[in-house]
């Protein structure tokens, strides 16, 4: 029984490129590989938003209206629905003058039990040290 831990670090602003959506899509799809794993093997995914990447977590995004795209907000909620660990760097939120009230914190309307965790960068660093594969977007 082995667990492969994946870490996704999102550090770029939303909608300027596909990086953020790729990170979230890969994290979500990592949960569907169980059909290819041996019994008892697992793949887990942690996602951390740091630097400019915390702007991806803003509430009430109007991506469909402005760009004709699904919002990053809905992708984050899908991650929570799949019980993925989603973290946002507290120091970077503070840098932008944002708080938990400004960002997506849950996906209750989807039936998700998980919530976004606002954490110090030291906790994100620990996650980066603990994963088997670390991907930057």
Model-derived regions, located:
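Histidine-anchored nucleotide/phosphate-binding helix
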Residues: 19-40, 47
């Amino acid at each position: 029984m082995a667990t492969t831990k994946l870490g996704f670090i999102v550090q770029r602003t939303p909608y300027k490129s596909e990086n953020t959506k790729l990170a979230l899509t890969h994290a979500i799809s990592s949960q569907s590989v169980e059909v290819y794993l041996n019994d008892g093997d697992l793949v887990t995914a942690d996602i951390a938003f740091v630097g400019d990447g915390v702007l991806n977590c803003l509430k009430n995004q109007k991506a469909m209206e402005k760009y004709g795209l699904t919002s990053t907000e809905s992708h984050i909620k899908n991650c929570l629905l799949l019980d993925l660990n989603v973290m946002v760097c507290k120091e970077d939120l503070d840098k932008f003058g944002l708080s938990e009230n400004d960002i997506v914190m849950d996906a209750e309307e989807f039936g998700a039990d998980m919530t976004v965790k606002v954490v110090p960068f030291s906790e994100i660093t620990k996650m980066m040290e603990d994963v088997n594969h670390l991907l930057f977007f």
